[in-house]
Amino acid sequence: MSKVEAQIEKIFTSFDKDGDGNLSWDEVFSRMSSNSNIKDPLAATKSMFDHYNRDADTENLSIQEIREVLMSKKIKQDLIRTEKALRSKVKDFRKKYDTDNDGVVTFDEMYQLYLKDPDFDEEDDELSAEEREKAKCRRAKSSCRYFFSAVDKDKNDKLSYLEIHEYLKKHPEFDLGPSQ
């Protein structure tokens, strides 16, 4: 049982005075009346029955009815939080890589940032500085090509908001990559 389901069970049990597994109108009204924060217990009881009573049984509320409504709300809230986090990540991605602020991330914009990243530096001491620089350029270009091949669906060497969004949605573990 999840934490949310345990909380639902606890609240339900506090309403279910006769312990029959259902909430009668009287049980709900009694509980609403005993809460000093509720100014109109009759309206609150009616509202609760209107909101949670999903079957033809208008006399009682089952824990299953309440659980279904609350869990569907929780799922919706989780989806909203996930979408907000995803939008924030897309915004951060564009802020980092869309260096000319034209609304798309080009291959060249990403490549130029990769070239500044020390993670792409070649550390082979036997290579000359020029050879190390060429190796770094090859590695940065290869990484950009690989990323663009996965994300750039229309193959125009530009990443749109939608392309970035769809990729990050499928790959939530994605790290924004090299530091600036």
Curated annotation (Swiss-Prot):
Q: Which UniProt keywords apply?
A: Calcium, Metal-binding, Repeat
UniProt keyword annotation of Zinc-finger present: no
Occurrences of domain EF-hand (ranges): 3-38, 40-76, 85-120, 139-174
Residues engaged in binding Ca(2+) 3 = 152, 154, 156, 158, 163
Top-level division of the source organism's lineage: Eukaryota
Q: Which GO terms describe its biological process?
A: aggregation involved in sorocarp development
- Binding of Ca(2+) 2, residues: 98, 100, 102, 109
Give a yes or no for keyword Metal-binding in this entry.
yes
Which residues does Ca(2+) 1 bind? Answer: 16, 18, 20, 22, 27
Q: What is the gene name?
A: cbpE
Q: Which InterPro entries match?
A: EF-hand-dom_pair, EF_Hand_1_Ca_BS, EF_hand_dom
The protein, known as: Calcium-binding protein E
* Signal peptide (UniProt feature, chain positions): none
| Entries under SUPFAM superfamilies matching the protein | EF-hand
- Any one GO MF annotation of this record: calcium ion binding
